[in-house]
Amino acid sequence: MGNQETRGMHFVPETYLNKFGVFDNKKVCSVFFFDKTKGDKINATSPSNLCKKRDMYRMEGETVEERQYVEDFYQNIETKYDHIYKILTNDNLIEISQEDHELVILFVITLLFRTQKLMSQHNNFLKESFIKGQSVANQYGQDHFTYGDEIIPFQDKTVNQILKETAKKNNPNRVAKQLEVALKLFLNRRDNSIVIFKIEDSNFSYLTSDNPVSIYNSETRMYSLSDFNNELALNIDSNHRIIIYPKSFIPFPYYMSRKIYSGEMAKSETISSNLEQFKNAEKFLISHEKKVIEEVIYFIEKNNLKN
């Protein structure tokens, strides 16, 4: 990895998305996806084409190793995902090693912090701040405004041009900071409880999205990503879902709890999870079957849940 420079970088790992796909006799994987920002038809494609952005984690540096530092870190975790997947989907496996337990939690937490939506939310906040800054500066006849400790000149520039320049300059620091925050959270949550849910009913399935980690917090409606009380949920494939709970949920270290749902319980569980995926997604819903996405869209339209 260190000798080859990656340009198209997946912010949701292809190896993860493959578990929601179907392989043909040539071992080529395909998934169905729906772009909720366009609201058009459901299409099929390779997971390699989804959830990818050019130079997303590219760092500053003179060597490939320096520029690839963050991308290589994520790729190293991704190479272990098949092992993680086998652990989570083995119904007979309850007790695991400390190393495997921590690897599962590391994957979920880093996935929470590496998606494009998190960066888009930051850019939207910047855009609002720049619009206000430019407006105030114009009132005083100035050609610049201050954002934090930085002076932002805007003469003959649109807000979008300023935002693009700022993002290009600051992106490496922000990417590194997000990884740093993720690792700090992991160190505080690496002994947390793991619960796996399995759907044993062919009528119901989980799907995923371009922002697949969902957050639940029963103690407050105003929480941060780094809140230790957050429950972190991730759909693993069409039949499996993992939730990471605070440590106290399971008193025995490195034990996993497993729950099996069918019938009405499976229906309720998958509807709830899939609606959360629709709400959290920046653009794409992703599934192994077209009808799974169609059912979510139908439920949302029928119950007027788009907003």
Spans of model-derived segments:
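Alpha-helical structural context detector biased toward long hydrophobic helices
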Residues: M1-G8, E14-N307
